[in-house]
Amino acid sequence: MREIVHIQAGQCGNQIGAKFWEVISDEHGIDPTGSYHGDSDLQLERINVYYNEATGNKYVPRAILVDLEPGTMDSVRSGPFGQIFRPDNFVFGQSGAGNNWAKGHYTEGAELVDSVLDVVRKESESCDCLQGFQLTHSLGGGTGSGMGTLLISKIREEYPDRIMNTFSVMPSPKVSDTVVEPYNATLSVHQLVENTDETYCIDNEALYDICFRTLKLTTPTYGDLNHLVSATMSGVTTCLRFPGQLNADLRKLAVNMVPFPRLHFFMPGFAPLTSRGSQQYRALTVPELTQQMFDSKNMMAACDPRHGRYLTVAAIFRGRMSMKEVDEQMLNVQNKNSSYFVEWIPNNVKTAVCDIPPRGLKMSATFIGNSTAIQELFKRISEQFTAMFRRKAFLHWYTGEGMDEMEFTEAESNMNDLVSEYQQYQDATADEQGEFEEEEGEDEA
């Protein structure tokens, strides 16, 4: 089997990670004690991707929980599925990172990282054929962003040929915990560009807007935001967990989705959107699902796809539906909106269908888009970064941990380069592709 080792780092990472395990355990018929009570062979066919089978037919998540303070992990442990995790896989410090990327990456986090890597090794050794790692973390804090990116680069060193996939929560001024979020996020993106194969950008701003506008929740809590994240993560990993036609393992997904190595930041989407506790009573049709799925209001990253163009798209439909109808609808979207798909990658939309719908829905659709409009998100963070960095505000917290201003300047320019790369491919057309490559050659010279 092709196993995936899951790592969750920091407060946000542990909260969305715990939620993810609740949702997929439920989908696979696994109760909080790790016993199977399902009703379909499909639930067990690829259970080994995310679970170890222990003695007594207990299924244990291949999950590693990491944090620099014990608080969040205590609440995971006492949460609904807290007892399903392997106790040795909780790795935590006592000091906390204080929302400081430098503490997570260079000082506090660096002290803890070896004990995390021991657990990673142990999990990887119990795998038959490890396909890769997935990390849930946020980019705004200290542990998930600083230590999360440190773990990525260490794991990259040790397992260079394995896929590294992250679910990264981007900070937003609308749901802000700290003033230094733009610093932490920029320093993290600097690492993610170089060291991951696939990054799902989950943006608090977009989640907030969905809760507020679409779900009509007046004061959305993190619980409501995490409900959306877990629905999306469940959808995105469907192809990895259930037998399907487009049997995406992480590597096949990367091959389909990433045309240029640096441009691996995906915009996830989900339809139909429902709030916690209220499920829709009307089954949606395939055309409605398709239409909703491509709508900017359903995107989990606060970017409007109409402001850019899609390099590649993957769509995952779940539930009993006609494959023919799905294919027709997907072609329909592409034909009607052809200007929003780059014409120099033909057939850049791939579709998978899985028979098992998520709990409480007859059918659902998950969207993964590699769109040049994601640059809006990086621009937003970059502007906030520059505003503070120009005045060297709050820098002493970072230099005090041994960082150099140079690193900030490098991270800033790497992020700006990323934005211009997206822009360059947005403007590229099929016929000028030749000239375009010559220019690239000159730049490098």
Swiss-Prot record:
Sites bearing Phosphoserine, chain numbering: 40, 172
Source taxon at top rank: Eukaryota
Cofactor entry: Mg(2+)
Modified residues (N6-succinyllysine): 58
Motif (MREI motif) on chain: 1-4
GO cellular component: cytoplasm; microtubule; microtubule cytoskeleton
Residues holding GTP: 11, 69, 138, 142-144, 204, 226
GO biological process: microtubule cytoskeleton organization; microtubule-based process; mitotic cell cycle; neuron migration; positive regulation of axon guidance
Pfam families in alphabetical order: Tubulin (PF00091), Tubulin_C (PF03953)
UniProt keyword annotation of Cell inner membrane present: no
Subunit structure: Dimer of alpha and beta chains. A typical microtubule is a hollow water-filled tube with an outer diameter of 25 nm and an inner diameter of 15 nM. Alpha-beta heterodimers associate head-to-tail to form protofilaments running lengthwise along the microtubule wall with the beta-tubulin subunit facing the microtubule plus end conferring a structural polarity. Microtubules usually have 13 protofilaments but different protofilament numbers can be found in some organisms and specialized cells.
Function: Tubulin is the major constituent of microtubules, a cylinder consisting of laterally associated linear protofilaments composed of alpha- and beta-tubulin heterodimers. Microtubules grow by the addition of GTP-tubulin dimers to the microtubule end, where a stabilizing cap forms. Below the cap, tubulin dimers are in GDP-bound state, owing to GTPase activity of alpha-tubulin. Implicated in neuronal migration.
PANTHER family: TUBULIN
Protein name, UniProt field: Tubulin beta-2B chain
Organism of derivation: Bos taurus (Bovine)
